[in-house]
């Protein structure tokens, strides 16, 4: 190959593979990211395998930067080609740790273009190095696969749809890392995808393929606006162009960016002057006028010239515009009606003005848009949104949420369209902050209804004090009809307006629903809050995620963890079960990582997932809060022996709790030094007898079989076992509160562990929810107890089913005996194991082990385990697993911990 081929990737392959015929040739720069785009089955993967040497065609040519790898005379095998290949499904060695997988393909030579530490830092793998692949989420495994490919010191990186098998949440986790690779490494990348949204974020060059042939190749923005190619006429037609930051207007929150052909003003946070930004201008956001308007709300009005027009179709026409008066600037697209074109008399070569109504910052340096705040150790500070979607016409201003600067007493938490009073997503969020020891003024809105059930107004409750406050004003008697969505919208609108008027530091709203996505609901109120400089924290259903991004520009923090989305996954028990489990694990793992990255919000805003931190206990007043069905109960907990002398040590960094939290709890009596065994004795042993119990009936609870300490409340519906809790209610001062639940497709037994910590022991205790779908209609319930030298996993014995009461509906109705036993430096509550004399059961009779009836072993979800271990350390945790029958109640019980 001559010097003419230097700086290029040249490839040409012809051949037949079964019925598929490949006849493709390309010549692209050997720098930056070149995307190969096309529909499934067009030959993208085949041409990548040919370049890598994994597929050999007799008629082929391949040269990289002037070095020939294949021609008619020679063929360099795959193992001798310096290519890093990242497949759709990451293939990691299961017997090696993350560190071992990364170093496996690294060359032995000392000279390297990219080092181990640099790869670990770029991809955020520090916290994962000691883990096994089965304990990684899908996104984490793919990041490890990318790191292993980079450490092989390749001259070319091939990425074959690396995000195709991932859900949107996990894609958004990985894309910022790919952007960092693009910005910091000079390595050429061939990126294969059929998703234009991925390509628009970081690709420089584009190759279009169709039916085994290359139909176009060139710079991304040129091909997007080429009237001879289908991209310009697609429904989501847009052009991606790069601009340089020239200035920032602090007053209006506007960036001024210079593009080829003029200046664009885009709402954004502050970005350094000279930084390069990727902009996306959709054809539907560009209108055309013959003369510059003197008065208009549209900020971006640029001189342009019509390059060409598409033939009219379906009443619309796509027009290619060249910015600048002579049309020599960057090309953009405009989609208008055929009638508008005729009324304006538009023709090729005509000078016009382009009104750009909306501009999206596809990739913003600084990563403030959508950033989750300060990062946890081992995590990268990166953007988490796919498209900031900042809209000029909306007047929104993108900004990060800096939790360090937020006054905890100036946070408005608004419960929008509540379904179960305080038993809702936002209530859980605010109460989590209270239980975690955070000093935050959570405000929850509640609807006020008259005797007929019609809504007549609102009230707001401060979750910290329980007092009613006046942030929301009543709307007047009879103002709303009952069961109308408009009522909830109007109430929430008043609440948002009141929060804006009081100039709060943060607005927390529990959902962004389909009404906002359709252009109704709280769009105006939220836009007003954003315009006033108040960040918004919300939970967004995945189906509304794009609408949220387009509307708000990713303002603040978006968590894809809404309860309804998860529950919808669990309701489907068809062949999609395996995929649902993977999706749920990925979402939950993502949420755990997010929660670990926030110093203020220690737990994820989601009902189906809870991650708790241990509380340092004061030896003079050790108390724990337990919330059951929205009611806060406070009970004493035991101070473990040996902790009294060391409990004054500071708590772990990043978890600001201490004596001030203890001091504001009411005095409920002395702290017991030791727990005594508790027994729950019930004479009801069979499902038939269980069904005969009446709702509200109570069964006595005795201590050591003699002293009555409480009752079991039987709250049962009808003979079909409608869900209802059975609660062990203890008198004031009793050490433990336990709840069980009986319901359709739900068998639940859980423990509330004393969350203590012996200072210096470097142990943590956390209780988290692990729920995953299985094909069996019955589910096992299990506890897992881990320590530095012991790892016990003994599921609770499966309960039987009652014929004729629905299909395979489990019945939890045997006699239950609970006792409390010490376990190292913590106490664990669980079913008592019958004595066994066999030597083989010595481990079960160990007094330091929580005795649980043995049953079939079941592994813990690797995604959840890996994410949990990143926060709390491996094996230093306690957790409970639940079936998918009713995720809401299962999560509620763990929220109570």
Curated annotation (Swiss-Prot):
Residues 6-236 form the ABC transporter domain. Residues 295-365 form the Mop domain. Residues 832-848 have a biased composition (Basic and acidic residues). It is an enzyme of class 7 (translocase). It catalyses: molybdate(out) + ATP + H2O = molybdate(in) + ADP + phosphate + H(+). It is a peripheral membrane protein. Gene3D superfamilies: 2.40.50.100, P-loop containing nucleotide triphosphate hydrolases (3.40.50.300). NCBIfam families: modC_ABC. Part of the ABC transporter complex ModABC involved in molybdenum import. Responsible for energy coupling to the transport system. PANTHER family: ABC TRANSPORTER I FAMILY MEMBER 10, MOLYBDENUM IMPORT ATP-BINDING PROTEIN MODC 2. Belongs to the ABC transporter superfamily. Molybdate importer (TC 3.A.1.8) family. This is Molybdenum import ATP-binding protein ModC 2. The gene is modC2.
